[in-house]
Each structure stands twice: as structure tokens, then as C-alpha cells.
Regions:
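Hydrophobic structural segments
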Residues: 1-149
Length: 149
């Protein structure tokens, strides 16, 4: 049985929290505990995403953007963290740490362009490198390849 904590720890191996920018709020932001059999991934956790996760019987959502970013001053039914707890769905959010991670967001984007001599900048949150000349049809074919992965 896979637990919330195990999924969270696995995500930290991929994108250690130490890579996050000081202003960011990544991590296990809503912990309902228990077993995880199904996970939904999303860029942002919105009320619609929570509804979809509940409909698909997911116990966890892994998102890029933090579901809690600013300090909470109140919590009510209109708030996504409240909706997650009510549905029993945990939330792991990996933002700038996933941007900066080896094999993370920016390395995947660099890979789409087949970037050469790639190096990190902005404390790891970006990548810069050389690309070869490419035509629009070649780019479309390459994008179709990545979309199929």
C-alpha cells in the first residue's frame, strides 16, 4: 500500500525542496493521510480539478503551482484547501524546485528544443543553450513526438 507520505518523499527525491526559491511554498500542503491508489496531476488545483479528482476517486493531487501560497487568514467552503480536506484529497505541490530539478520542467523544455551545451541560470530555475536551425514542419513533428510520450 502506497501512502501519502511515500508519494511526497518520492517527489522530494525528484525535486528536493532545497531547490525551491525562498519565496515559494512547495511541499505536502494538504495532508489527509492514508493510502494512495490514484493520483491526478495538474498545473493548478482549482475547484474543478478537485471535483475531477473526487469523481475519479483520487486520494492525491500533484500540482506544479502551490495550492496555498499566501498565508491563510480564514478557511471556508469556497477555498480550495477546504475542498481538498472535505473530499479527503491530499495535495503535493512542486513549483520552483521542480523547475530547477535535474530532469525537471526546464530540462524537459530544453529537451524539446534539443538544446546543446545547456547550462542552468537563475539559481537553477532556467536553462540556456544552443539550438540548431529548425523549420516549422520539423518543429511540429518534434512536438508530436513529445506529445506521444
Amino acid at each position: 500500500m502506497t501512502t501519502v507520505r511515500q508519494v511526497y518523499e518520492a517527489m522530494q527525491v525528484i525535486a528536493p525542496l532545497e531547490l525551491a526559491e525562498h519565496w515559494d511554498n512547495p511541499g505536502l500542503l494538504v495532508d489527509c493521510g492514508g493510502a494512495v491508489h490514484r493520483v491526478l496531476t495538474a498545473l493548478d488545483i482549482t475547484p474543478e480539478v478537485v471535483e475531477e479528482a473526487a469523481a475519479k476517486q483520487c486520494e492525491m493531487i500533484v500540482s506544479h503551482h502551490p495550492v496555498i501560497f499566501d498565508p491563510l487568514k480564514r478557511l471556508g467552503p469556497q477555498d480550495v484547501p477546504f475542498q481538498l480536506v472535505r473530499a479527503g484529497i491530499s495535495a503535493v505541490c512542486m513549483h520552483t524546485n521542480l523547475d530547477a530539478a535535474e530532469g525537471g520542467v526546464n530540462e524537459v523544455l530544453a529537451g524539446i528544443f534539443d538544446m546543446k551545451d545547456m547550462e542552468a541560470f537563475a539559481e537553477g530555475c532556467g536553462r540556456v543553450g544552443a539550438i540548431e536551425e529548425i523549420t516549422v514542419p520539423q518543429r511540429v513533428d518534434a512536438d508530436a513526438h513529445y506529445a506521444a510520450l
